[in-house]
A protein has these predicted regions:
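C-terminal catalytic histidine-bearing segment of alpha/beta-hydrolase fold enzymes
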Residues: 2-10, 44-46, 50-53, 292, ...
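Catalytic nucleophile-loop/oxyanion-hole region of alpha/beta-hydrolase
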Residues: 150-159, 170-207
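Gly/Ala-rich beta-loop-alpha elbow adjacent to hydrolase catalytic centers
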Residues: 212-216, 220
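The feature captures the conserved acid-bearing segment of alpha/beta-hydrolase catalytic domains
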Residues: 248-251, 266-302
């Protein structure tokens, strides 16, 4: 990094912070974690991408910047204005940390945006290793309890790590059901997988690993079941702390009702949709699987993963389990202890 390139300005409008010191401390930690300099300012000092916190409902004058990551602490509609590359919304003050990470990965480990539909959220970020290929492909499906405030930036770190290990990474964004409906979400992840056939890279489509985190674990394993007879299908499917039993998830009100909010109804009112969508109900999948859990995660998710592993084994699926220390995000963190075991298992299957 050069002195200029490792600097990030966070341009904040007056009055957006309830306590400026708290925000400054959070920003300092986030910058330090990535080896960056910068801080909260009134105006940007360079020409690189900046983080802008305009305040609720305010417009960003994008003509002032080459590229912007916008942050709104509360929930709001997405800002699709020109030059706004990403909009972090609804994540509270911690949105600043996510924004700094987004700038870091975009600046130092850029990918190529590939669209698979007409809607702005129908896109993936492709990263390709050095060399000629063809490369095995890791398809990444982010979680966030199917809510629109969570986007594919959650998978940036693991995408960069896997690319460095020799995998092309296909980091999928999709329309979430809280804003677009359950069928739209299901259709988007299927379309994103199928779009690998026309991806602008040398890819080995016989070596696809489909990796989903949290709610993305449900989407990934449901997609695996749906793709068995399709032209593009995974050779290995990973659940990373996945919500693999939607009936149990609904009964236990996981994520403050995240399952029924996503599907649009409780299990008793929409049993057919739940059973079509729940990986537990789709067994056997007929594709090798790896079920990954961090033992410090929500005990409901840990229990669901263990129950799913037992059921998949009983259904004669080829399935393995990896458990290790950490919380919910350890399974997508390349610096975590469990990550070493995850990539070793994937390498053994595909490399």
């Amino acid at each position: 990094m050069t002195e200029d390139s490792n600097h990030i300005d966070i341009v904040a409008a007056p009055g957006v912070f309830a306590d400026l010191q708290t925000a400054q401390e959070l920003v300092a930690r986030a910058l330090s974690a990535r080896g960056l300099s910068g801080g909260i300012v009134d105006a940007a000092t360079g020409s690189d991408e900046v983080v802008v916190v305009p305040g609720d409902g305010a417009q960003v004058d994008t003509s002032l910047y080459s590229s912007v990551v916008r942050v709104d602490f509360g929930q709001c509609p997405p800002d699709r204005s020109e030059n706004i590359r990403a909009h972090i919304r609804g994540r509270g003050l911690d949105g600043l940390r996510f924004a700094i990470d987004s700038v870091y990965f975009h600046r130092f480990h850029p990918g190529t945006i590939v669209t698979y539909g007409d809607h702005p959220e129908q896109r993936v970020e492709l990263r390709v290793p050095e060399g000629d290929g063809p490369f095995p492909v890791a398809v990444l499906i982010h979680g966030g309890y199917w809510r629109s405030r969570w986007e594919f930036d959650l998978m940036d770190a693991m995408a960069v790590d896997l690319t460095a290990r020799g995998y092309a990474t296909w980091n999928v964004e999709y329309r979430r059901p809280d804003e677009h409906g359950w069928d739209t979400t299901t259709g988007d992840v299927a379309a994103a997988l199928a779009a690998l056939e026309t991806a602008p890279a040398s890819l080995d489509l016989s070596r696809i690993v489909l990796m989903g985190h949290s709610a993305g674990g449900q989407l990934a394993l449901r997609l695996t079941a749906d793709s068995v007879d399709e032209r593009v299908a995974p050779a290995l499917a990973l659940s990373l702390a996945g919500v693999l039993d939607l009936k149990v998830g609904d009964e236990r009100w996981l994520g403050e009702g995240a399952v029924s909010n996503a599907i649009g109804a409780r299990y008793a009112e929409a049993r057919r949709i739940y059973e079509e969508s729940s990986p537990m109900s789709r067994l056997p999948l007929g594709v090798p699987q790896l079920v990954v859990s961090a033992v410090g995660d929500d005990p409901n998710l840990l229990e669901i993963s263990r129950a799913y592993y037992a059921a998949a084994s009983a259904a004669s699926d080829s399935v393995a389990s990896v458990e290790g220390p950490g919380g919910h995000f350890a399974v997508v963190d390349p610096t975590s202890e469990i990550w070493v075991d995850i990539v070793a298992a994937v390498d053994a299957a595909l490399m």
